[in-house]
Amino acid sequence: GIAFTDGDKIRVQNMNRAKKNLATYAYSESTSKWNTSDALYWGVQPTNTFNAWYPATSAYDSFTIPTDQTAGTDTADWMTATTSANRANGAVNLSFNHNLAKVTITIDKWENEYLENERVISSLELSSLSGVMSYNSTLSGDNQAKWVKTYTKDANKSFVAIIAPGTYASATNIMQVYVNGSTTPLAVKTRSNLTVEAGKAYSFKLAIGKDLATITSSVTVGDWGDVDLDNQNATQQ
């Protein structure tokens, strides 16, 4: 998403301290504030550097993309922020960037071979490079494509997943669709070379046939959007 919701947690680190330099902040929707019970202090330097990341259970410089996103994409939305703040001001402003890419898939058409009661998407999976993402959007680990199970936004109609940046050659199997309980998926191939970039949102439209599913129009690309946090405080010490 492009906004934090109630209970979301971020991790913040003061890079100018060796101790009391980490805190987990939880967002309260009722107060529009970030709260912590941890000790996060300023360093003695006039200007301190802060790194932050979401989810709080991940890390600033690496992230493993979950391959099962059927329960939602929040824990897959790896974001990081870094800023320099003035100790005298006492406030830290953070602007989070999405390090991965968001993909939305819409079922645009069912071919006539399907009866109305057969037009059921049992599962839709999206190909993504796997392994551990690093902050500069490179990948370590096995660096192989794996299937990510998407989140169903609208039953039999709309599906969402978050994947790694990367390049797909033309005619690459980028999706597989399981229809009406079938254990044999329909393959979806790219229509041309496709480069997926960090921080972008991609939209695909599919037509579902008996033997294959196809992308029906050009892929739509837009900015995913960044998230700003203003006036978060570290303690003077």
Regions found by a protein language model. Give the residues of each.
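Edge beta-strands of extracellular beta-sandwich domains
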Residues: D61-T67, T183-S192
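Short beta-strand elements
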Residues: A76-T82, A187-K210
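Short, small/hydrophobic-biased targeting/export segments
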Residues: N173-M175
